Amino acid sequence: MLFRSWNWVKELGAELVDIPLTEKGLDYRLDLDAVESGYRSGVKVHLLCHPHNPVGTIHSRGELEKIAELAVKYGVTIISDEIHAPLTYPGNEFVPFLSVSQAARECGVTVTSASKAFNLAGLKCAMIITGGEVLKNRINAMPLSVGFRASLFGAVAATAALRDGKSWLEGCLKTLDENRNLLRNLIDAKLPAVGYRIPDFGYLAWLDFAALNLGSDPCATLLERGKVAINSGSMYSPRHSQFGRFNFGTSPEIITEAVDRIARSL
């Protein structure tokens, strides 16, 4: 599964190769055989979404160790997008990719930002982190203009959030935890045919609308009938047009109204 925002890869003159996750119901995992097949075919860079948006899965230490081992074997650089990691719920373990092994440090680059966890996306600041000398030298050789794309306000805000924002983040996670469970209860009561696996992190729910028989694009139908805007699964993969990404990072009242509107529109 890929996010279509990654179409910028084509602007670099590179070929985008989609390596789907394995699916057992709404349980998604890395397909290690498919990953190795992709590496063997000549893939040079692996864009790893960790934890995974939109399906709500956190990759395990064992999975990360294996893809690091494969990446070193086949000469692949892994770019681990860990922007949602601070929003991991208590009881779930997030393991930073670079921490799993020496192989991961040799082949891996982590990209992250305070923007998702602390709601700072408009301030434009991100970080590139690596643990290996070869990749460190490659990053240091990047044009200075790359750094100019961050804003001064973004750098100041990110520093403040990451240094002093622990108590705020804990409160945010408590609210989001209540919201994800509220959504589960509402779906169970009013939309029992909709598939929903409670996410391990974040404020995004991956919903399966296939059983509702709402046509080729259920999210478009729900927008037209119920005036509820949900990201269509087709944004992430043409195979998932019957799915939608629901943002529950809002008030309980709005979540309840959204589910009520969906239920009334059926």
What do the predicted segments below correspond to?
Residues M1-L2:
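Short, small-residue-biased leader/transition segments that mark boundaries at the very start
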Residues T159, L176-R184, Y196-F209:
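Conserved glycine-rich beta-strand-loop-beta hairpin in the small C-terminal domain of fold type I
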Residues L21-N92:
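Active-site phosphate-binding strand-loop segment of PLP-dependent enzymes
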Residues S101-D177, L186, L266:
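Conserved core segment of the aminotransferase class I/II
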Residues L12, K73-Y74, A104, G226:
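Helix C-cap/helix->beta junction micro-motif
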Residues E36-S37, A104, T221-I230, Y236-L266:
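PLP-dependent enzyme catalytic core of the Aspartate aminotransferase-like
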